[in-house]
Swiss-Prot record:
Polar residues bias spans: 7-19
Protein's name in the database: Large ribosomal subunit protein bL27
SUPFAM superfamilies documented for this protein: Ribosomal L27 protein-like
GO biological process: translation
GO MF annotations in UniProt: structural constituent of ribosome
Encoding gene (name): rpmA
Species per Swiss-Prot/TrEMBL record: Streptomyces griseus subsp. griseus (strain JCM 4626 / CBS 651.72 / NBRC 13350 / KCC S-0626 / ISP 5235)
Length: 85
């Protein structure tokens, strides 16, 4: 076994791809059912009315309406407010 690394060899040179997390639909924006609202690790935002949570903590719309961000009992929540017809 060589105890010196060969020429132009390195132990570095790796980097992971970005995860593209964050808010995808902002407050007041109209959405349809199934649209992704927030991609996150952990529950930075909690699901509110009309919002579901996936296995990777992604929040998505369960119904069509407008996105609304707010707080409930000290937690940040995302709600879907039905649009007036």
């Amino acid at each position: 076994m060589a105890h010196k690394k060969g020429a132009s060899s390195t132990r570095n040179g790796r980097d992971s791809n970005a995860q593209r997390l964050g808010v995808k639909r902002f407050g007041g924006q109209a959405v349809n059912a199934g649209e992704i609202l927030v991609r996150q690790r952990g529950t930075h935002f909690h699901p509110g009315t009309g919002v579901g949570r996936g296995g990777d903590d992604t929040l998505f719309a369960l119904a069509a309406g407008a996105v609304q961000f707010g707080t409930h009992r000290g937690r940040k929540v995302v709600n879907i407010v039905p649009l007036a017809v």
